[in-house]
């Protein structure tokens, strides 16, 4: 991936914009999770109820250290054994990010990805980004850049070109406290 594309995406994120980008299985919408206006824009674009919350993704485990360091060692070990990879973990939220990210929950969903583009992007950005499937409510998630543009047109500030990793379904979601699978 050209450094120019990554820098353009970082610029969009830094100024509170919304980005579309490829992930492991589907195209995603993302933004700076500390920018409430950007998080709200994503919810509006998707027509997604705020109560559901959103996932944060990064390519660097250290971006989640302030969340992981609060966990018992056994929970932390269980999480780290699945990363990087397509497993999202729900952990207690200390209120670090925009409240809309956690929705009506007292926890936040986080994932460390192995997708090379997202790894490069979050490293350059210096933190995690919001990651939610690129689709309006009730529609199938976009699996191509064309589908993503068709859904959102100019509602997205930047479309980061790239390829999906080839997984057939979005990430599994698990509860860190219980280990329960919340989404298969």
UniProtKB/Swiss-Prot annotation:
This chain's function reads: Required for the formation of a threonylcarbamoyl group on adenosine at position 37 (t(6)A37) in tRNAs that read codons beginning with adenine. Catalyzes the conversion of L-threonine, HCO(3)(-)/CO(2) and ATP to give threonylcarbamoyl-AMP (TC-AMP) as the acyladenylate intermediate, with the release of diphosphate.
| GO CC entries | cytoplasm
Matches recorded under InterPro entries: DHBP_synth_RibB-like_a/b_dom (IPR017945), Sua5-like_dom (IPR006070), TC-AMP_synthase (IPR023535), TC-AMP_synthase_SUA5 (IPR050156)
Q: Which family does it belong to?
A: Belongs to the SUA5 family. TsaC subfamily.
- Which Gene Ontology terms describe the biological processes this protein takes part in? regulation of translational fidelity; tRNA threonylcarbamoyladenosine modification
Q: Which gene encodes it?
A: tsaC
Catalytic reaction annotation? L-threonine + hydrogencarbonate + ATP = L-threonylcarbamoyladenylate + diphosphate + H2O
Superkingdom is Bacteria
Q: What is its EC number?
A: 2.7.7.87
**Cross-referenced PROSITE patterns:** YRDC
> According to its UniProt record, where is this protein located?
Cytoplasm
Organism, by scientific name, is Hahella chejuensis (strain KCTC 2396)
Q: Does Nucleotidyltransferase count among this protein's keywords?
A: yes
Keyword annotations for this protein, in alphabetical order, are: ATP-binding, Cytoplasm, Nucleotide-binding, Nucleotidyltransferase, Transferase, tRNA processing
Q: What broad class of enzyme is this?
A: transferase
Q: What is this protein called?
A: Threonylcarbamoyl-AMP synthase
- Per UniProt, residues of the YrdC-like domain are 3-184
For the keyword ATP-binding, the answer is: yes
MF terms in GO? ATP binding; double-stranded RNA binding; L-threonylcarbamoyladenylate synthase; tRNA binding
Q: Which Pfam families match?
A: Sua5_yciO_yrdC
